[in-house]
Amino acid sequence: MARYTGPVCRLCRRETMKLFLKGDRCYTDKCALERRNYAPGQHGQGRTKVSDYGTQLREKQRMKRTYGLLEKQFRAYFDKADSMKGVTGENLLVLLERRLDSAVYRLGFASSRTEGRALVRQGHFLVNGRKVNIPSYVMRPNDVIELREKSRKITRINDALDGVMRRGLPSWVELDREAFKGTFKTLPVREEMTTPAFQEQLIVELYSK
């Protein structure tokens, strides 16, 4: 299955929840979901009864689309989460937040995870002083992400940083705006991962069938 390249606002409408795929636009009344809070297409406003399986499948699609993963990649993360100690659904969310592209987004270097992935691949970041261009690189507590010197005048990065300074950062990361440097302080806990509001247990139930 190829990666989706169409209008990302349609994905939020399809899932009937904000997936925060469009940067600052998602926080304004220009958000497509604010204007049309129903699925796209001719029958988008129609009411249909959704089965338990359908509800579970939708939740999986929401999480996959939020983190920009294909089914094979997502299933690999789930299998790893399932093999770990603790609650599988919570483990899954933590693994996804530990991706470098997610950390770049959470720190505000990118306005969306998709943009974060592109910036990582283009080699704009150092992790603990070493260039890393793999979006799935696994972050560890106290890892330091630094924007390379030659990238610090890029307008879209500075705009994204200004945006996150207004909105605030999640508790598991820390940003030094002036130094273009951020720290992945600790592993996030479930209570802190509130946006988007996933029901990860539905995904566990789906894959456990």
UniProtKB/Swiss-Prot annotation:
GO annotation terms (biological process): ribosomal small subunit biogenesis; translation
Pfam family, one: S4
UniProt cross-references to SMART domains, sorted A to Z: Ribosomal_S4 (SM01390), S4 (SM00363)
The S4 RNA-binding domain, residue ranges: 98-159
An example molecular function term from Gene Ontology annotations: structural constituent of ribosome
Sorted UniProt keywords: Ribonucleoprotein, Ribosomal protein, RNA-binding, rRNA-binding
GO cellular component: small ribosomal subunit
InterPro entries: Ribosomal_uS4 (IPR022801), Ribosomal_uS4_bac-type (IPR005709), Ribosomal_uS4_N (IPR001912), S4_RNA-bd (IPR002942), S4_RNA-bd_sf (IPR036986)
Family: Belongs to the universal ribosomal protein uS4 family.
Primary role: One of the primary rRNA binding proteins, it binds directly to 16S rRNA where it nucleates assembly of the body of the 30S subunit. With S5 and S12 plays an important role in translational accuracy.
Oligomeric and partner information: Part of the 30S ribosomal subunit. Contacts protein S5. The interaction surface between S4 and S5 is involved in control of translational fidelity.
The protein's name: Small ribosomal subunit protein uS4
Species assigned in the record: Syntrophotalea carbinolica (strain DSM 2380 / NBRC 103641 / GraBd1)
